[in-house]
Amino acid sequence: LIYRLTHTNKVYFLSRPRRFGKSLLVSTLEAYFLGKKELFKGLAMESLEKEWNTYPVLHVDFSGSKYNSVDNLKAAINKQLLLWERVYGREEGDTTFSLRFESVIHRAYEQTGQQVVVLIDEYDSPMLDSNNDYETQKEIRNIMRDFFSPLKKSDPYLRFVFLTGISKFSQMSIFSELNNLQNISMRDDYSAICGITEQELRAQLQIDIEQMAQANNESYEEACVHLKQQYDGYHFSENCEDIYNPFSLFNAFAQKKYANFWFSTGTPTFLIDILQECDFDIRELDGTTATAEQFDAPSDRITDPLPVLYQSGYLTIKGYDPDFQIYTLTYPNKEVRKGFIESLMPAYVHLPARENTFYVVSFIKDLRVGKLDECLERLKSFFASIPNKLDNKK
């Protein structure tokens, strides 16, 4: 997949949930373009690539800071530009972010004789962090637009451009201006580029599964079933095979238990903000439908939680109707379903933690012993507490 990605087009965008391997993919691309052949020993890339050229790589990661103010974003961009300028130099007339970025690209090309590789990880973090403040987000959007603008003008100097994020902001100029940008987020041929497939799990992680089974007093196949129920089930295109959450899977192997690791890292605040602002019946989430156009977030304001819930990994594709081009969405696995009830739903409907714990624990206990009538009554009671419309002023 990496070889195909780097040899069939120049500019790509990939959307995946947090902690799903996007940064590892970016680091892999960086190692490849830096010519680090030794890191690919024994892999398909070692034999596929014949030249192993070294390119100048400009790698920026927007996930490392909080961008709830314009000053924070400006400081982060300035810091990154200074790091590049220490390597390639700076002209006195380079005063704006766009001029400085453009000059770095040009000088890197001139000094190395090779086209430049630009890797931008979590490009949308600044917009998502400022989603609850429209004026701040508007300023941040303009700064980001200015910063990204040299990528179009510098096309002859660029070998490869790769952007990752959670959401695709459809009206951001970077998506309309970049030459031949390919959005591979929902393409079948790249659906498994992040995450772990069933085949990879059984072929590469057999020892881990055996140790997991032994630690939990179960058979190998029972461990596989538990892992699949807990961490599998992600689909990123209509014909995508099942994908495991890599963060949860590797944490489960490390700790030898089936816990909710993905949710333990915290629910993104932007998602809670969006859920609290939107008029959306969360009882309809499991099995809801969406068109492909709905997966793009508008650049001015996110008002529909559905695409964000999908792109954030709380919902995944369950089915696809090619006649109407409609996707059916559902929770991917037990970890997400349980985590949603415990984490997102209380934030959405403002339930106190004590009351939330009571509902969840009682519901699970009744379900385990087969008290289906009691389960239904608890669900009715729980959903009755949810207002039909949220008060956005609260």
Feature-to-residue mapping (PLM):
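Phosphate-binding site recognition
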Residues: 1-394
